Amino acid sequence: MERLWAPWRMEYILEAKDPVREECIFCALPRAQTDRDNLIVWRGRYVFTMLNKFPYNPGHLMVAPYAHVADLDALHPEELTDLMLGVRRATGRLGRVMHPDGYNIGINLGRTAGAGIPGHIHFHVVPRWEGDHNFMP
């Protein structure tokens, strides 16, 4: 395959070129308390899980702390533990509901590493299936 064509991500790509971004979505959306509208599917003590509005694959989740931090070192041990437990919870739920063959799980630390929102750390949990021909940078 020469090119990945994911037209549902075009809105995200065009927004990413706009240097003026409003408030961090990982701060604003949980405060709004409208979880269904904001695609938040689970809340923990220190972290929450939401569907990615611009997914790489069906079921693409993001697990983020409520704290606005850019690096793992900035999280307290309890927050870091809750973050990893949130990732485990996400894979468990996706496994029961969507039955993927595997997952891509990762963090893009910094804009150079591909972070679209470099100021707020978050894990991507992307379910994968044999032959899905998808890609996660």
Please provide the spans of the model-predicted regions.
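HIT superfamily nucleotide-processing domains
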Residues: 1-137
